[in-house]
Amino acid sequence: VASNLSEERLWHLLLHYRPTIGGGYESEADEAGFFLAANGKTDPQAELQQTIASFFSTELVGRSRQPARCAFIARYHWLKAELGIDETRLPPQSCDRFHAWLKELNPASITLIFPSAYMNNPSSMFGHLLLRVDQKNQTEQTRLLAYTVNYSADVTSDNGIVFAVLGVTGGFKGFFSTHPYYIKAREYGDFENRDIWEYRLDLSPEQIK
């Protein structure tokens, strides 16, 4: 069963696996703490098996140094549903840090935000995408306080030539960040005078969570 699950598209999405020219897989994630198996970056099955084994351990793993069930909670919920894992057989874990974070976000819906191109910056010619986590009973005014999930390049050089080469070839590392929406709205709308388009996504409560 585990072998078949390692071939599932959702498992590949969770681990950011992409097919390689040689017929294998390699994850786009570079953080060593993102993988539980030594060869997890290139072996979906090994990572799956080690992930399942880690659920039965109290060892602290990952960048956040938490038990595997809490550090990789999306993997856990998917595998629990697919394998019918009995939680009573696992070491008890409350995942307080995750639940406190989720309570702060208080997600009720997700909106896709598209700031259009910024003419003074060629690197923005295709615009940008980010997600806004909207809360229940949110108004037009309070939506500015909602959190966003953003992925962007970690620009390490202000040299124009280096910036252009690394930007076009994917030479910069990418990172996720979470900020209140008013910060991004001010950056894109007020400072750069971009048009900002919003698209409410049709997601189920489980997908939103």
Label every PLM stretch briefly.
Residues 1-39:
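Intrinsically disordered, low-structural-confidence terminal and linker regions
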Residues 101-109, 205-209:
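Active-site-adjacent bridging/hinge elements
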Residues 185-209:
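Active-site nucleophile-His-acid catalytic modules used for acyl/amide transfer and hydrolysis
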Residues 108-194:
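Glycine-rich catalytic cores of cysteine/serine-nucleophile enzymes that process amide/ester linkages
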Residues 87-92, 128-129, 141, 204-209:
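Structured, non-membrane catalytic/scaffold regions adjacent to prosthetic-group chemistry
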Residues 24-26, 46, 184-187, 206:
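Short, compositionally biased low-complexity segments
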Residues 24-105:
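Low-complexity, highly charged intrinsically disordered N-terminal segments
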